[in-house]
């Protein structure tokens, strides 16, 4: 698809508005959804537990999260629990087109007569298309029944609403600065156009939203920033910091999908290579374990002495980017920060070294500087580019244009680990929707007993057998026989 005035219009069939690559892929997508359900015991147990009581009835959830097969199972779990849903992806490359088609068609529809959920997502969106889709996801067809819940990944949906509110209060959308990223310019342009055609739109939406549940580290950071500034217009639950999300999705999911992305993108041997992982949080830990398991020689960069010490105790070197970049064969950013790999670092890299990012946004690698540098770009295949510097003649291989390589070059995290994360998302949506009066406009975490509930289901699915405390043992530890077993400050 390309961005034209005509293409940025939703399709409508059988009363459902949508925009996906190809509805004829729905049958393929449905087969993969059926397989994924067997690997997602958390979501399936929630369907079994709550289907009759319909706790999300009346909820109109706008979701911004990678439109994958696993996300499709999440969407159909939300609808099974009574919610109405509209969806867009949170990354221009992460959509699996057959999954998007399957969700629109639904389990009982056909491409000619879809009976599923409105989805606005396809792999390879332009920035203009991405933000158009985000607005479609937040714009419900009946103005008297607007979105009242947001499910977010990275915070783009939340930011669109809250920045819109800020600019409506100010009476003007600020002009873009010369050095602003291309995406920020597109974002401001969308808000400026909407300010001219539908003044007050975002304020109305913010007033109708009961809460947001946020999936990622990056999105959670945005929530805390909005809250600190007094601009958070509704309660938020930080799903990312549930133990069964961050310690599983972030680490074990990445441990699986990083290698998958590098292999599909380059077919390069990893064993014996020098691999530089920037960041040693949960995502970085998963990346480092994966590379080590392949036989690579792994070096870590870190700002935090505690994380750096952990890396050293695991046998990894800890160095600065500028000191090791020239010797690195593969470089992966996993920090959640910006400006980690700059143009000067890219120019210093080995000829044909591989560069990729597994943090949520594309600003960990300074792609804008690379594009301005005069380096020539040769597209090898989708999401794999060879950039050649004219002054040295050296080239580097950049994966997914500096965006998430595990979703751009591969299919993301496996179903089982996403079952943990998405079970938390579903529980958080139920919590905010059914107990909204208990929450102020602040950022919250799910209670420990719900974290343990999610873990218990997955332990059983893997054939694990939990030991049961006796009453005396529980009293000795000062806990209930059935948990929670650890205090909130416990570090797993």
From Swiss-Prot:
Cofactor binding, per record: Binds 1 NAD(+) per subunit.
Keyword vocabulary terms for this entry: Cytoplasm, Hydrolase, NAD, One-carbon metabolism
EC numbers on record: 3.13.2.1
Pfam family membership, one: AdoHcyase_NAD
Catalysed reactions listed for this entry: S-adenosyl-L-homocysteine + H2O = L-homocysteine + adenosine
GO MF terms held by the record: adenosylhomocysteinase activity
Binding site for NAD(+): 216-218, 250, 279-284, 302, 337, 358-360, 406
Cofactor annotation: NAD(+)
Pathway: Amino-acid biosynthesis; L-homocysteine biosynthesis; L-homocysteine from S-adenosyl-L-homocysteine: step 1/1
Hydrolase is among the record's keywords: yes
Any one Gene Ontology BP term: S-adenosylmethionine cycle
Keyword NAD belongs to the record: yes
InterPro entries: Adenosylhomocyst_ase-like_sf (IPR042172), Adenosylhomocysteinase-like (IPR000043), Ado_hCys_hydrolase_NAD-bd (IPR015878), NAD(P)-bd_dom_sf (IPR036291), S-Ado-L-homoCys_hydrolase_CS (IPR020082)
GO cellular component, one term: cytosol
Principal EC category: hydrolase
Residues holding substrate: 68, 153, 215, 245, 249
NCBIfam families the UniProt entry points to: ahcY, PRK05476.2-3
Function description: May play a key role in the regulation of the intracellular concentration of adenosylhomocysteine.
Name this protein carries in UniProt: Adenosylhomocysteinase
Origin species: Mycobacterium leprae (strain TN)
